[in-house]
UniProtKB/Swiss-Prot annotation:
It comes from Mycolicibacterium paratuberculosis (strain ATCC BAA-968 / K-10). Belongs to the bacterioferritin family. GO terms for molecular function: ferric iron binding; ferroxidase activity; heme binding. InterPro entries: Bacterioferritin, Ferritin-like, Ferritin-like_diiron, Ferritin-like_SF, Ferritin_DPS_dom. The gene is bfr. Heme b binds at M52. This is Bacterioferritin.
Length: 159
C-alpha cells in the first residue's frame, strides 16, 4: 500500500526520535545501575524498551506503506552526568516528541491516514505518562534535596 510521502517523512522522523531515546535511556539506565540506583535503573531500562516497542510499531507502519525505515540516523544524545541531568535530558526528548507528534496527528488526519494518526496518538499517551514520571522525579528532587532523593534511590542489599 503506497503511503503519502509527507506521512512517511513524519514516520521516519519519529523513528529517529525513538531510536535516539532507546540509546539515551539505555545508557542512562546502565549509568544509574553502576551508581547503585538499581531500581531507578530498572525503570529507566523499561522506558528504553517502551521506546523500542514504539520504534517497532513505526517500522511496521513504514513498511506497510511501502516506505523504507531509516535506522542510520539518530538525533544527538544528551547524556546526563548526574540524576538531575539525566531526568532533564530525558524530559527534553519527551517534550520534543509532543511538539512533533501533535501537528503530525493533525496532518495524518488531513491526509486521511487515520491508522498512522492513531499510532501517533498511542505514542503521545505513553509519552505523557513518561513526562509525568520525569516531572515528578524532578519535583521530588527539588522538595527533598538531591542528597535525600538520591539516598531513597540507593538499592539496599538483601538481608
Amino acid at each position: 500500500m503506497q503511503g503519502d510521502p509527507e506521512v512517511l517523512r513524519l514516520l521516519n522522523e519519529q523513528l529517529t526520535s525513538e531510536l535516539t531515546a532507546i540509546n539515551q535511556y539505555f545508557l542512562h539506565s546502565k549509568m544509574q545501575d553502576n551508581w547503585g540506583f538499581t531500581e531507578l535503573a530498572e525503570h529507566t531500562r523499561a522506558e528504553s524498551f517502551d521506546e523500542m516497542r514504539h520504534a517497532e510499531a513505526i517500522t511496521d507502519r513504514i513498511l506497510l506503506l511501502d516506505g523504507l525505515p531509516n535506522y542510520q540516523r539518530l538525533f544527538s544524545l544528551r547524556i546526563g552526568q548526574t540524576l538531575r541531568e539525566q531526568f532533564e535530558a530525558d524530559l527534553a526528548i519527551e517534550y520534543e516528541v509532543m511538539d512533533r507528534l501533535k501537528p503530525a496527528i493533525i496532518l495524518c488526519r488531513e491526509k486521511q491516514d487515520s491508522t498512522t494518526a492513531t499510532l501517533f496518538e498511542q505514542i503521545v499517551a505513553d509519552e505523557e505518562k513518561h513526562i509525568d514520571y520525569l516531572e515528578t522525579q524532578l519535583e521530588l528532587m527539588d522538595k527533598l534535596g538531591v542528597e535525600l532523593y538520591s539516598a531513597q534511590c540507593v538499592s539496599r542489599p538483601p538481608s
